[in-house]
Every structure is written in structure tokens, then in C-alpha cells.
């Protein structure tokens, strides 16, 4: 799974441990709770009447708390002529609300000493923050305002769009990043899995404030959303606070595209000026949940997971053919 962290502007692959499998709770009519004894030690879960699922792990030895809100609003859900919208929207969500200007919002987050950010991936959008444990209530209040009442001001949209367009140009100028985009597009031809999080210059330039709001209204709903908390916090108090802040939230996002591609073997070359050549090969990999998933993950790590991997030792150290070589996997594309 490829994820783009807007806080650090870096590309990384999410591990299986970071993934939360969502269960459809749109038909729930009452809240339900699961204690840590029914799950793993120190874990708890609560489902609110509106379908919002909350999970948590108490870690009393820590002085901080990290929480994240994951929504069923991924890159695959973007309209074909609005590629890059989810990335732009997740940046815009922090640019002021109906109750706080962008300056007020920024100052309040800074007063908390919060590290916050957003991520966009094929299947979801995620917002997260790390704060001192005794400031969780205030941080949740800010995030509720951000998610439920975004202002999406035009002036900030123009600035965020310019930043995203610059990032697109920068990515196209970096051969290593570009080759991953190219193999993804060729392997997943005519599938939402082929999309780039940043979109294209043409589509990003065309996205309007109304487009952002329409997508937010269509897909930012509690049913299918997961709120997770880990660190030094009181579970019961957190459940009560989340219920106060998000209890009036309603609705469910429409079903996402699920059609899988059927890639065919091919070879393609894109000439580019420069002294380096970049080669990438892509193969089918067992999906997360497949009986062979973990075995394939281990094999991939042995084959190309670091400086002790077989690829590194044979191709770089022994033969001196390359500067860098690696193997990796993405369980959902």
C-alpha cells in the first residue's frame, strides 16, 4: 500500500500492522463496546450508533498520546477528471473551519505542541496527531472542527494548489520516483489503482472549491470511519468525549470501486536525459489475508530487504552493477 504523508511529504509503504480492516456498521442502531479481554491485551473497541468505530490501546508508561482518524475516502474514489483531489482536500482541511480562521487553528494546534498531518492512500484518507496525554480532549475538539466544519477558503486553495503543482513537477524530475509511477500506471492500466496521489497538472489546475466540498459531503461520513487512540489516556473518558464531539455526525459514503485489474506481461522503456538508468520490475503478490501472504513477505525481505539481502550482496557488492537495489511489496496495490 502506497501512502503519502503530507506532513513530511515523503513516500512510504504501510506495514500490515498499520492497516485496520473496517467492518460495515452503517446499519447499527446502538453503541457497542468490546473490552480488552475479548481482543488483544490492553485493547478496547467501541462502535457508536452512527457507525463510527473507535479502537484504543492504553500505554500508561508513555506521557504522550497518538490518535488517527481514517475515512473511506481514498484516491480510488476520485472522479476521473479530478485526480489529485484527495491530496488537495487533506491539505485544505487544516486551512480553517467555520469557527476558526486558518491562523486561529494553527495557533491552537501549536499551543498544544501537536504534531499533526494527513495522509492519502488508494483506499482511505487519514488524519493524525501526537500530543501530550492530558491535552487529548482539546486535540479531539480541534479535529472534530476540522473534519465536520471545514471552511475550504478560496485564498488558501490557490496557495495549496500551487504547492501541489510544484510537487508534481518535482516528482516528474526525479527518475526514481517517476519510475514507480510509470510501472504502477502500466501494471494497473485502466484501474483506480494506477492513479497518482498528486494527480496531474491538468486535473489539479481544474479542481474548484465546489469540487472539494462535493467530495467531502459525499465521502466524509462516520459509517466506515475508524478513530484510533494509543498512549496514556482514559478509555472511558475518551469514549464519552468522542461521543459528544462526533455523535451528531451522520451518513455513510457510497461503495468504493472494487473492480480489480488483469495486468498482462509487457516491457516498456521511457528515454530520459541523464547519466543514470533506472529499472523496475513488478509481479503479482499475495493479497493481505492470503494464506501465502506472510511467507511471501519474508521471501521479499530476504531477497531485497536491505544491505544483507541477496540482491544487494550479489548485484551491488559482488558484481558492482548498481548503486542501489531493493525489493518491496504492496499488499493492496
Predicted segments with their positions:
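Charge-rich, well-structured scaffold segments of protease-associated domains
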Residues: 2-31, 43, 47, 55-58, ...
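His/Glu-based metal-binding/catalytic segments typifying zinc-dependent metallopeptidases
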Residues: 57-59, 68-70, 254-309
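Short loop/turn motifs at secondary-structure junctions and domain boundaries
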Residues: 36-38
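M16/MPP (pitrilysin/insulinase) zinc-metallopeptidase core fold and M16-derived inactive scaffolds
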Residues: 61, 66-130, 306-321
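Short beta-strand micro-motifs in enzyme catalytic cores
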Residues: 44, 65, 125, 277-281
